Amino acid sequence: MVAAWVAADAPHRLIALADDRVVGYVAVLNGVGWSSHVGELRLVVAPDFRQRGIGRLLAQRAVVEALELGVVKLVVDVVAGQDRLFDMFTKLGFEQEGRLRRHVRSTMGDTHDLLILSHFVDELAASLASPAAAADDDA
């Protein structure tokens, strides 16, 4: 598996490749105005490549990128019921800050709550650099 920055004109995006196939994507989008210190993390992993640690690795790399960009607070949206994704982000130190009721509509027309998670990047970067986090990565 190889991870590479997409292009010089999109420095806040990272992809994961397997045999020249894009199997994961993460982006850090900068906030504007009063929220210019906030970055939004977006993460997608191909269904057949989930549960392999790709999402966690991409999220960790996005945190490092956010820190380098000067982002203070990083937020991510998770659809309620995506328990594994929610658990992954909480293990990285994110906390739920809000819930938007019936905010997401599926292709089948069902509505779901949207959970808003956040973490201050400097705290998260310190936890990722800890010996305990390194031991988790070896598992």
For every predicted segment, state its role.
Residues R42-V44, V75-D77, I116-S118:
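Short aromatic/hydrophobic contact patches that present stacked aromatics
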Residues V75-V78, T90, E95-H112:
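Conserved catalytic-core motifs of GNAT/GCN5-like acyltransferases
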Residues Q51-E68, D87-K91:
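Conserved acetyl-CoA-binding loop-helix of GNAT-fold acetyltransferases
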Residues G39, R102-A139:
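C-terminal "cap" of GNAT-fold acetyltransferases
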Residues M1-D48, A59, F120-D122, D138:
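Acetyl-CoA-dependent GNAT
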Residues H12-R13, V22-V26, V63, L69, ...:
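Central antiparallel beta-sheet cores of small beta-barrel/beta-sandwich binding domains
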Residues V22, R56-L57, A80-G98:
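Conserved active-site alpha-helix within GNAT-family acetyltransferase domains
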Residues M1, L67, R84, Q96-V104, ...:
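Catalytic cores of nucleotide-enabled group-transfer and carboxylate-activating enzymes in metabolic
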